[in-house]
Amino acid sequence: MTTLMVQGTTSDAGKSTLVTALCRWLLRQGVAVVPFKPQNMALNSAVTADGGEIGRAQAVQAQACRLQPHTDMNPVLLKPNSDTGAQVIIHGRAVTSMNAVAYHDYKTTAMQAVLASHQRLSAAYPVVMVEGAGSPAEINLRAGDIANMGFAEAVDCPVILVADINRGGVFAHLVGTLELLSTTEQARVKGFVINRFRGDIALLQPGLDWLEQRTGKPVLGVLPYVTDLHLEAEDGIDVRQGVKHARVLKVIVPVLPRISNHTDFDPLRLHSQVDLQFIGPGQPIPAADLIILPGSKSVRGDLAQLRERGWDKAIERHLRYGGKLIGICGGLQMLGREVHDPLGLEGAAGSSQGLGLLDYATVLEAEKQLRNVAGTLSLEAATVTGYEIHAGVTTGPALAQPAVQLADGRHDGAVSADDQILATYLHGLFEGSQSCAALLRWAGLEDVQVIDYEALREHDIERLADLVEKHLDTAQLRQLCGVA
């Protein structure tokens, strides 16, 4: 059994992508490999085969390994629900919410869960490919660390350090990170990968030579800047990302502070007939064919922000002019009359008035609903697959006209009597070809082109493995992975 860990000099250095690439590359070598991330902080999550939730990046990495996602792949998931606190999910199940100070004291317990999951995976697979979090050199977070070098030291594994050259300062990032590690941690770093390089590698070579001489560690390769990958991100969305013009159907997604599972919109971002725009603070909602209220980790707080930004009035105007509106998960809850949080699960206990566009109310309960589901859309009887991740129980007359008939006999969501509003708890609505096409036609798009989102994702995973073969030192990688 071999464990190899990828750590980064910064957030968004390329850790998730590199782990995905290495997983598929190893699979091509005939090696049974499994992804692992000890601790993840993200609002994008996926439902696992064993009925829990993990970070979405680990679900993509599982696909790279041709495995079903499992809670052991990401034993600790932190889902921020305020500026200072987060819901703590252990082995796929929410156990509590706590602030940063309380979580620091909880890390010993969390580490036990991390090591138990790693032990199970390492007993079942010859290679465990691990992704770190953020940077291992955050001085204020090093005590009790379970996400980076604290984990690497505990399981005695080698580390690859990746840095993003596109941001500038790559040599300072790599050398500075190394300098801030302890002597034993420095010894764990077996080499560097430089990510997102543009230009002639010959111009970079003097810097690479200096880096190897300065640190005594090899550069395992330089990965090129790739602009058109279609793999889900695990962290926050850039509201400037994905803005396209000259498309047929205009779709607007208001970006609220606690937006969750924004990966729901990746298929729309890639669709050639859709102009998808994320609207952030200070931006008015423009005229559009479809507005989608996304999921939220703090529904009442995001409702207040929506009103403060004047977006509630923009949504009402949008509907008056015949536009279509979809609410997904937290967005569904916002569309109703009221949202009640008697236990204070998402902040202070209390109730908030919803937008009042559909006749139902939601009560947030401690037990979270986690399911992968399949069913049929009320629109065109289109096949739909997706997943539920929510703590709310919604009741009311509007549910008598459901949006989805689920295969397990349940109904989901609602469609308004005037057919302008569709609300659902299902994430992943647009990933299926049939359901995506049906929803786009409902929103006003004619002659819809069908895209196979799953095939696009699989193609990109293969492309990443090709980049490993072409640009990294595969002989050294095989040695680090214990592969002959």
UniProtKB/Swiss-Prot annotation:
Q: Which family does it belong to?
A: Belongs to the CobB/CobQ family. CobQ subfamily.
Q: Which GO terms describe its molecular function?
A: ABC-type vitamin B12 transporter activity; catalytic activity
What Gene Ontology terms for biological process does this UniProt record contain? cobalamin biosynthetic process
Name this protein carries in UniProt: Cobyric acid synthase
Alphabetically ordered keywords of this record: Cobalamin biosynthesis, Glutamine amidotransferase
Identify the residues that the record assigns to the GATase cobBQ-type domain, covering every copy.
248-435
Its annotated pathway?
Cofactor biosynthesis; adenosylcobalamin biosynthesis
Enumerate the Pfam families for this protein. Answer: CbiA, GATase_3
Tell me which CDD domains the record gives. CobQ_N, GATase1_CobQ
Establish whether keyword Transmembrane is in the entry.
Answer: no
Which sites are catalytic? 329, 427
Its biological function? Catalyzes amidations at positions B, D, E, and G on adenosylcobyrinic A,C-diamide. NH(2) groups are provided by glutamine, and one molecule of ATP is hydrogenolyzed for each amidation.
Q: Which domain of life does the protein's organism represent?
A: Bacteria
